[in-house]
Amino acid sequence: MKILAVELSSARGSLAWRDGSDADFVRDWQNDRKNSGPFFEYLVEVQKKFGKPDTIIVGLGPGSYAGTRIAISAAIGLSMAGGTGSVPSDAKTESVGRHGGRPSIRLIGFPSICAIDCDAAEYCMIGDARRQTFFFARVRDNNLAEGPTLMSEAELREKMDKFDGKMSIFATEKLPQFERAEVRYPCAKVLAQLASDPKGNFALPPLEPIYLREPHITVPKR
């Protein structure tokens, strides 16, 4: 099965192509939500080199909503277009996603925090959820065993104190409040590997970022 994996939820973006038992193409870069140029350059490169995938898997976070939406939009465009031609713009991608025909490529999503580049079979993931809150999740064998749950700093510190020193604790950015947390990033190569599992618990379209809170909707004044 030819698999294309896309991960843009953290400060390190990555893209991977897998055909068989190992990844044939892996790219990672410093991910800037204001500049998606490197992502689309690598996306064009992998298309030219390998052609059409059978499956596209997207990391859904939690993390950067902007980055995750870009990844989802690009994946929708490729799945609807059959993986041919140039990479669609955001506007074209959204139009195809709403009004296009049946996709010729399988499109799935998976929590980015379950695809951390590490050797640990079990670990905890924490992150800054803004508004003086943090999220906590526990991952076992690349699946969510707990969370993600929002907590105050005090609640998270109490939670972490219950784990012994052998438990790995990761975050996608440096959190000075929690010295024990090691910076690690989600990895498209791991996502591609997980997508090859026919029994995987994947999200199906319509794909959305993993929201830690309900999406904020502004109602226009009349």
List where the protein language model places each region.
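Oxyanion-binding and handling regions
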Residues: M1-D24, D32-P38, S86, A91-S95, ...
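Bulky hydrophobic/aromatic packing residues
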Residues: G13, V46, T68-I70, G82, ...
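A generic structural signal for ordered secondary structure
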Residues: L15, K49-F50, A74-G77
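Short amphipathic alpha-helical segment that frequently serves as the phosphate-/nucleotide-binding helix
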Residues: F39-F40, I72
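Phosphate/pyrophosphate-binding loops at sites that engage ATP/ADP/AMP, CoA/4′-phosphopantetheine
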Residues: Y42-T55, K162-D164
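Active-site phosphate/pyrophosphate- and oxyanion-stabilizing loops and adjacent acidic/basic residues
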Residues: V44, I76, C114
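DPxDG-like acidic metal-binding loop motif
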Residues: T55-G83, S104-I105
